Amino acid sequence: TEYISKNTVIPFLFDAARAKCKVAFENPGGPTIWDHLRDDPDRYIYTAVKHGAVQALPPEIAAGVEDVSARTQWNQKAPADFGLPTEIWREVVARRTRYAEVRAKLAAGEVREINDLITLNLDIRQFAQDVIERCEGPDLLRAFWNAIEGVTVLDPTCGSGAFLFAALNILEPLYETCLDRMEAFVADLERPADGHAPKKF
């Protein structure tokens, strides 16, 4: 439920915000929201995907990366330092390879569409939170605020309401982050640069 909600609600918000503040998404030669992904790739890759990736593979396992005939131990269970619960070495190597590929894409600035975060199984909630929290101008913040205020969620199953609650749990932190960022903008606006109270027009 949470997976479906975040991967439908958040892309809607980004598409709505993009329509009202295109420059934050498409700005050749200038900063965009996608820079967050490039500047800190690991922040948006789930911990489970990165598990054990910083450690060098044992020699007997690493030998099989290039030499298929050296994979005799790849079907054995990997220790906890390297593998997730129930993972065998073959799965560990595949996960590490995937992690390296995804991280390289992010670091190269190749991910520039919100749906790519779904395709690559990235932390789309953290990205949305960071984009709003780090807004440098009011236009993008206003665009997200309007999108959040105007979103309508329909529960297709009309069951217990779990889908609606999941959507609420996704929207509420973003709503609060918008308010916090608005307060910061207002505080900056009201803070006099020369020590005197600003004139009101």
In which residue ranges do the predicted regions lie?
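Class I S-adenosyl-L-methionine
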Residues: 1-157, 163-200
